């Protein structure tokens, strides 16, 4: 599990990801299962049994490292993950999303699909209506020099004076917009 957390952390900080070889199945063939995140008050479907972990990450906002909770797993040729952390000042949530996106998307280019345009708003019911609540599909070079695709969404939920900052992502060898829509469409704030 330690290796998984290191890989996921690298992906968040530098847009790096695990790239596995193989051909992906249709989304119907993946064994989707619903996972409840009680602390986050969120449901999401994963195509594999996710591992969980926590690590401190400094997003460069001037607040120092924050404790990020992570959940993720590998299915066929892709890594699926969900991460979240609590920002004490909800008024800075849009800024936090911008910093996280900058850390994850640096040096990557957009790869739009028929029904998924990079930078399009992504605001699930119950999420804060923020300009940086978006969906993006980008392509870039992975840690071993291979081309990789990152499908990601960023959004926030207000919790009193705080905000929970949430990021869901798929790292894969090629774009798979249908599977990404299946994964992101399953995100439900309770």
Predicted feature residues:
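Bacterial N-terminal signal peptides that target proteins for export
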Residues: 2-12
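C-terminal motif of bacterial Sec signal peptides marking the signal peptidase cleavage site
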Residues: 20-22
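Bacterial signal peptide processing site
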Residues: 24-26
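Post-signal peptide N-terminal segment of mature Sec-exported envelope proteins
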Residues: 30-53
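Glycine-centered tight beta-turn/hairpin loop motif at sheet-sheet or coil-to-beta transitions
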Residues: 37-41, 75-79, 143-145
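Surface-exposed amphipathic alpha-helical segments
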Residues: 38, 50-52, 96-114, 160-190
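Signature of long, low-cysteine stretches enriched in small and polar/charged residues
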Residues: 45, 49-70, 104-159
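A short acidic-to-branched-hydrophobic micro-motif
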Residues: 68-99, 165-171
């Amino acid at each position: 599990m330690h290796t998984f957390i290191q890989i996921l952390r690298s992906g968040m900080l530098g847009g790096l990801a695990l790239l596995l070889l193989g051909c992906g199945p249709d989304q119907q063939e993946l064994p989707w299962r619903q996972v409840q995140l009680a602390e986050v008050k969120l449901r999401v479907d994963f195509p594999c049994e996710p591992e969980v972990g926590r690590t401190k990450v400094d997003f460069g906002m001037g607040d120092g490292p924050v404790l990020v909770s992570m959940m993720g797993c590998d299915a066929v040729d892709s890594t699926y993950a969900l991460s979240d952390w609590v920002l004490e000042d909800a008024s800075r949530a849009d800024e936090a999303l911008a910093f996280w996106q900058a850390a994850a998307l640096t040096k990557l280019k957009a790869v739009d699909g028929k029904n998924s345009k990079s930078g399009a708003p992504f605001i699930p019911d119950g999420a804060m209506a923020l300009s940086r609540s978006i969906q993006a599909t980008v392509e870039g070079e992975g840690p071993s020099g291979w081309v990789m695709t990152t499908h990601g969404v960023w959004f926030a939920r207000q919790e009193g004076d705080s905000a929970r900052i949430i990021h869901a992502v798929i790292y894969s060898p090629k774009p798979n917009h249908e599977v990404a829509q299946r994964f992101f469409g399953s995100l439900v704030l309770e």
